[in-house]
Amino acid sequence: MARAVHRSGLVALGIATALMASCAFAAKDVVVAVGSNFTTLDPYDANDTLSQAVAKSFYQGLFGLDKEMKLKNVLAESYTVSDDGITYTVKLREGIKFQDGTDFNAAAVKANLDRASDPANHLKRYNLYKNIAKTEAIDPTTVKITLKQPFSAFINILAHPATAMISPAALEKYGKEIGFYPVGTGPYELDTWNQTDFVKVKKFAGYWQPGLPKLDSITWRPVADNNTRAAMLQTGEAQFAFPIPYEQATLLEKNKNIELMASPSIMQRYISMNVTQKPFDNPKVREALNYAINRPALVKVAFAGYATPATGVVPPSIAYAQSYKPWPYDPVKARELLKEAGYPNGFSTTLWSSHNHSTAQKVLQFTQQQLAQVGIKAQVTAMDAGQRAAEVEGKGQKESGVRMFYTGWSASTGEADWALSPLFASQNWPPTLFNTAFYSNKQVDDFLAQALKTNDPAEKTRLYKAAQDIIWQESPWIPLVVEKLVSAHSKNLTGFWIMPDTGFSFEDADLQ
């Protein structure tokens, strides 16, 4: 009997000890509810900001951007540029290892940039690196990158989230499958990827920055429905959610356990029109559609006021952005222009969206109703990431089914070239990049190319203005809004925020 009691006492003591330990050392596990799924964990092969944001769990670049989109050193200590703008010499930090134990050094940088700049690899972000002529490892901590021609925004390319340093041993081991097996120098390493449900990352014990990371794990969970994301925060199923349904922002703000954040962004939302296809090859049709959309009403209906009507094709916070008089809402003028263009009774078309979350659905419904008022019947489709990759990003002009396409773009390099060239340069039609209007203008191409060859701010201003003036006049887009970024998190989560390009910053995140 005494023996049995003693065992019970030990069991009870064990349970109590375990409970005390769990309280003292509770796992710091964070769930992040995001608006759509991920396409790949290879940053060089991802066209969407979300996939690249999640990849920051594992990967780092030579440089990065802070939350004001200012350049910062990461794996690099410093850099110099030759007088002719052709050669970039980068000094690297020492003593850093990849998550598989491989040394981070100049040879690793060369392996990554050689892969990225080789067109034979067919990587979606190849266009960022196509100007690299060669990369040389001068010594273990010195890399020399030689360009084919001067490219004044190149250091911003090295700071882009795509320019991640992947373990060369992992690249050799996994080859084209590297998107499923990320190995970087970042604060977290892959735990589980359930491709239909979540990506879970865990603390990398060998991370090079002392005291980091502070979290034990992060689970990135795609939740397409806005209301469900908000509910997960309120029930404690998630500690961070983005984007937050605008209509629920006020409600969440009243919750004493949740902090709501509305921050400026460089995310421009727009509808591109395929100018190689009728009726969008007619400038009057494109002009008519711009008059047909009531942007201030769209801001209220779909974004609950957390956006501003677009005044250009580049968000105002990007350097060299030009602002114009916003398109007024004038359905009478729209119908007149359609009649002049030969469409007195309107026409039928398709309107696709690059996302299927609730806000995108609202934009589609609102736009569909607005177009109907001027005689245009639009069949709408909200795509998931897989559909978008296959039907939009993966098809060239001849086979593309894109007509009208609602999407968004944030220039993750923080400068004007990446806000313009991927979307308007002739060489950047899909599947190369994201010129979903299939727009082409030789003058625009020339102005954009010349702007990259000069470091003179006045000359850059002139060239970028000239390009934007033409684009605004020819209207391959219906520019809609520049978003404000609305996110929310549990008050006990710190150091986790949204970047202006809609990416995430979480390296020093902690759960109190």
Curated annotation (Swiss-Prot):
Gene expressing this chain: gsiB
Subunit-structure text: The complex is composed of two ATP-binding proteins (GsiA), two transmembrane proteins (GsiC and GsiD) and a solute-binding protein (GsiB). In the presence of glutathione, interacts with the transmembrane proteins GsiC and GsiD.
Chief location bin: periplasm
Gene Ontology terms, MF aspect: peptide transmembrane transporter activity
Annotated compartments: Periplasm
Signal sequence bounds: 1-26
UniProt entry tagged with the keyword Signal: yes
GO cellular component terms, A-Z: ATP-binding cassette (ABC) transporter complex, substrate-binding subunit-containing; membrane; outer membrane-bounded periplasmic space
A family per Pfam: SBP_bac_5
UniProt record, GO biological process: dipeptide transport; DNA damage response; glutathione transport
Key words, A-Z: Periplasm, Signal, Transport
Reported function: Part of the ABC transporter complex GsiABCD involved in glutathione import. Binds glutathione.
Family: Belongs to the bacterial solute-binding protein 5 family.
Disulfide bonds: none
Source organism phylogeny: Bacteria, Pseudomonadati, Pseudomonadota, Gammaproteobacteria, Enterobacterales
Protein name in the entry: Glutathione-binding protein GsiB
Superkingdom classification of source: Bacteria
